[in-house]
Amino acid sequence: MSRRKKGFTNYEINKNIAKILVLHRVWDGLNQTKIAKDLNVSFQQIQKYEKCMNRISAEMLIDICNKRKWDITLFMNNKPESILDELIKNVNQMDPKSSPYPLRISQITEKWDKIDKVGKDNYYYKHHFTKGN
């Protein structure tokens, strides 16, 4: 399998993009249906991006970021965990009782755990690679 800069495999790149997509969506309190409507695709398509079943195109990623006013540079060469850590630092300065973010942080990490568990199998099955490459 080809390698990218910094030693990321194609799967790792797609997994990080999926995790960052989940992070932004959940952090903003959005569901997959809302994102899908914004992009004129089915919610199943968003689901497939988030499960690493389909690769998201650059055009679609740009479209999502423009419509949701997300910083596209966060999707490039960033570890999702470091982005979440920065968001958590900002939340820690708020009153946790009046903030929806502690629950959202929990939802994000739960969804990330699912990506870690099934994402690689989904990716390799979909793209006809052999596990372990």
Describe the role of every protein-language-model region.
Residues 2-27:
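A short, Lys/Arg-rich alpha-helix, primarily the initiator
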Residues 19-34, 63, 95:
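Short basic helix-loop element that most often maps to the first helix and adjoining turn
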Residues 26, 40, 51-53, 80:
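Residue-level detection of the helix-turn-helix DNA-binding "recognition helix"
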Residues 28-48:
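Short alpha-helical DNA-recognition segment
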Residues 76-114:
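Short, charged recognition helix plus adjacent turn
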Residues 110-133:
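C-terminal regulatory/oligomerization modules of transcriptional regulators
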